[in-house]
Amino acid sequence: MSQTLMHSRFSSGFLHHQPEKGFLTLQTQRRHAKTLKGEKEFPSRVVSCHKNVDSSKNFSSSCEKSKTQEKILAQTLGATSDGEAIVQPNNDFEVTWQNTLRRKWDAFSIFSRPYSAICTIIGISSVSLLPLTSVADFSPAYFVGLLQALIPFLCANIYTSAINQLVDVDIDKINKPYLPLVSGEFSMGEGRAIVSALTFTCFAMAIMSHSVPLFVGVLVYFLIGTAYSVEHPLLRWKTKPAMAAFSMAGLMGLTIQPTVFYHIQNVLGKPMVFSRSVAFATMFFSIFAACLGAIKDIPDVEGDREFGNLTFSVRYGQEKVFSFCLNVLLLAYGSAVVVGASSSSLLCKTVSVIGHTVLASLLVLRAKSTNPKDPESTQSFYMFLFKLLYAEYVLIHFMR
């Protein structure tokens, strides 16, 4: 009997290859398997599973697989008559730097929360287009200015996610056991090194840009992201519902929209004018982000309650918070329809009214199929909201 080992983020421990014993059953929750062949050890990975294995038949695990599951070299799997799981290595198995690098990159992709990083990239790219008035504005100076904004804000965004994970390791053992610092893919030392590198890079790039709006934006973003997570009597804003909502609004709305807009105006030598479109974007994304922050905490009630984090969901209940956020988002879309309808341009009026009506309808339909008490359902709804954000970054160009 033999099976292929697969990676799982939910288990830990060591298994040993003992070829002198027979195969009967497998019951293990271990993660890092080590096989012995002579005096050498062969690191491998094994999925966490409670299954009986028939030694005469093949089986396939029905255990949950990580979305970032790695493709690794095949091993054979079985168990001894004592219930001890064992592994037989393939002769050609060996650890390579490519495998290690791939594993670390996969861990970093989870560590950086790609959906948030993508939102930052799309948002900055979109807002940077608002000051442009003609094709001639697509100059080398514009693209340099865009990169000057993208790199430090992206580093600051990943820093915010990383510092939160460094501080919340114990809570994440309950709420998010797949995160690299919890699963062991990253050590605490590696996490701190990444945070330090991101901090240096974001400020170095902001300073070298010689752009006051950009530096102020990056500094405020960094300070809010730090205050949101770090332990301090006056900080740790994520445990204070009102400050947590302000933090999300500040990060995604009040900071990026105006500072990137003014930065590009400065790069292009245009007068500092706060346009109708950037004013709408700042207000809309601030409201949307505050609701995102509250919805983000809905699946984490168990861990937050155990560690005394009095989020809105812990205080008022998941269903009430979900319903309130949904109504606020619908109000924001309704306001967007009104603002769009007041445009003097027929094209802008038509696109903004129809576009926001469609997005609001999609929001309602998705909300009806979401169960606030089901963490997976709520997390899926949370990710859906980011798709609505991506669409909004297109519509803001018609709010003129």
Curated annotation (Swiss-Prot):
Q: What InterPro entries does the record tag this protein with?
A: AtHST-like, UbiA_prenyltransferase, UbiA_sf
Question: Is Membrane a UniProt keyword of this protein?
Answer: yes
**EC nos:** 2.5.1.139
A cellular component term, taken from the record's GO annotations:
chloroplast
- Asked if Cytoplasm is a keyword of the record, the answer is no
Where, subcellularly, is it found? Plastid, Chloroplast membrane
Q: How does it sit in the membrane?
A: Multi-pass membrane protein
Q: Found in which tissues?
A: Expressed in roots, leaves and stems.
Q: Where is the transit peptide?
A: 1-48
Reaction(s) the record says it catalyses = umbelliferone + dimethylallyl diphosphate = demethylsuberosin + diphosphate
> What do we know about what induces or represses this protein's expression?
Up-regulated upon UV-B irradiation.
- The domain of life for this entry's organism is Eukaryota
Matching entries from Pfam families are given as: UbiA
Keywords of the record, alphabetical order, are: Chloroplast, Membrane, Plastid, Transferase, Transit peptide, Transmembrane, Transmembrane helix
- Please give the Gene Ontology molecular function terms for this protein: prenyltransferase activity
Q: How does activity depend on pH?
A: Optimum pH is 8.2.
- Which enzyme type, at the first EC level? transferase
Give the UniProt record's GO annotations in the biological process aspect.
cellular response to UV-B
- Provide the primary localization: plastid
Give the family this protein belongs to, as stated in its UniProt record. Belongs to the UbiA prenyltransferase family.
PANTHER family in alphabetical order: HOMOGENTISATE GERANYLGERANYLTRANSFERASE, CHLOROPLASTIC (PTHR43009:SF7), HOMOGENTISATE SOLANESYLTRANSFERASE, CHLOROPLASTIC (PTHR43009)
Put simply, this protein is called Umbelliferone 6-dimethylallyltransferase, chloroplastic
Question: Which organism was this protein described from?
Answer: Petroselinum crispum
